[in-house]
Amino acid sequence: MTRTEPNRSRSSNSDSDKNSGNVGGGRTTGMRVIVPLQGVVQGRGGLFLGSVIPCAFFYFLQFYLKRNRKNDESDNSGEQNSSASSSSSPNSGLPDPTRSQSAGHLTELTGLPRSLSRILLSPRNSGGAVSVSGRVNCVLKGGDSSPYYVGQKRVEDDPYDELGNPDGVIQLGLAQNNKLSLDDWVLENPKEAISDGLSISGIASYEPSDGLLELKMAVAGFMTEATKNSVTFDPSQLVLTSGASSAIEILSFCLADSGNAFLVPTPCSPGYDRDVKWRTGVDIIHVPCRSADNFNMSMVVLDRAFYQAKKRGVRIRGIIISNPSNPMGSLLSRENLYALLDFARERNIHIISNEIFAGSVHGEEGEFVSMAEIVDTEENIDRERVHIVYDLSKDLSFRGLRSAAIYSFNESVLSASRKLTTLSPVSSPTQHLLISAISNPKNVQRFVKTNRQRLQSIYTELVEGLKELGIECTRSNGGFYCWADMRGLISSYSEKGEIELWNKLLNIGKINVIPGSCCHCIEPGWFRICFSNLSERDVPVVMNRIRKVCETCKSQN
């Protein structure tokens, strides 16, 4: 009997099988390994199909992989497409030495075709949402949906102009004073305003981040004039920074730790939510004042808020006041200031006195008293807990030239503030321009006087016009605002009713005002109106638009 050679071809074996027709036991086992489907499809047909189907499947798989490999590798110029035979070579299972081996679990996949490795790897976009810090969530919490920001956006998109856009939105929500500025002085003194003391080397070199000494001296003189010479300010206790918001934030950082809080009587500036909380982690506890008390602070209510916070485990580090008030424009009396100092001493907390409108006090009624004057004249007051914020941008109508001052009696706070202003310094051109503008006492006196007269005139005309429409305002003696009582126009005594009226004022009347809820007023229906940017010709236009809203509200009610 002829033996079957191990190296014979498959065709020879087939011929031998046909001739001999004799299949031994060992040969049967080998055939079943080579032809796995013979046991499924019986008979002579099973032998044929069991051989053809695996081979066809194998070659179709090779064709599929070859085609996809060509598509994947066509992006890499300079590489040749792999042939179908290379996949069966002895070295085809080894990792490609040109591939990176540093990816840990990817090392085992580097020998696979790219089409297979991509299937085995997790999708590139399966890592979930990219997280950000909790501080960002705090910033986004206020959102652009607040009426405070929505109104500003409407003004930006459709600003009123007497000639160019008479149907645009009139801005009555932002503290700006475009109608009076130092433009006249700039025109009269172009050399001093633009080039006096300036050079490329002068403005491009490093300067003290807390302000030039020459500017501090000029600011101290301006603050003395703004307070009607009631107190003399020491330039060495001044730290200059880029705006009142930056000053409030720096003081919040210096006086409180994350999780601590400040007491803030309300209604208050909408900006405190941003200035105090966003980056410091310090919280605000609002202390409500009511119209029945003319929105005056009550020491009893302050004391109650302090102890309620203490019971909740919140440490109160200070109180923030505005004098003149934002949004009401009222002034704090000497008695109020003394009571606040006693309260701060008894509770061992700080006082931040926001006096950014000190140079914009108008009217004959009331007297502006700076906290610095109280501290300067009283010997038994703990002055290290008193800190004052002053804003040159507001009083000088240089709102784009961000410049403000921290005036403190606490050396630790001053030292830390000087370092923190590295993140928010006043620009060199702004400093040199301000030095030229406010170093002349006569120029400062003339500007402050003109500013106060103009504010008083516009305020009086606006309040009288509102009164004719049945809208009363609280008495304002300082700043750019009047606090208008529109409770008679709201559809329901609620925040919802207040926002509905605000929408009508914005969309029907096309005027942007700030609803009291943005100022944390607990009584709905009050609105902050900024009048400083109005001219005498603008006031009748505003009155006509508010009258239109009043008629709409009355017809609907």
UniProtKB/Swiss-Prot annotation:
Reported cofactor(s): pyridoxal 5'-phosphate
Gene Ontology BP annotations: biosynthetic process
Tissue/organ expression: Expressed in roots.
Pfam families: Aminotran_1_2
Ranges of biased composition (kind: Low complexity): 77-92
Chain residue ranges for the region called Disordered: 1-29, 70-104
Keyword Transferase: yes
Record flagged with keyword Transferase: yes
GO MF term list: pyridoxal phosphate binding; transaminase activity
Expression triggers: By indole-3-acetic acid (IAA) and cycloheximide (CHX).
EC primary class: transferase
Taxonomy, superkingdom: Eukaryota
Protein keywords: Aminotransferase, Pyridoxal phosphate, Transferase
Role, per record: Probable aminotransferase. Does not have 1-aminocyclopropane-1-carboxylate synthase (ACS) activity, suggesting that it is not involved in ethylene biosynthesis.
Subunit structure: Homodimer.
Family: Belongs to the class-I pyridoxal-phosphate-dependent aminotransferase family.
Name recorded for this polypeptide: Probable aminotransferase ACS10
Originating species: Arabidopsis thaliana (Mouse-ear cress)
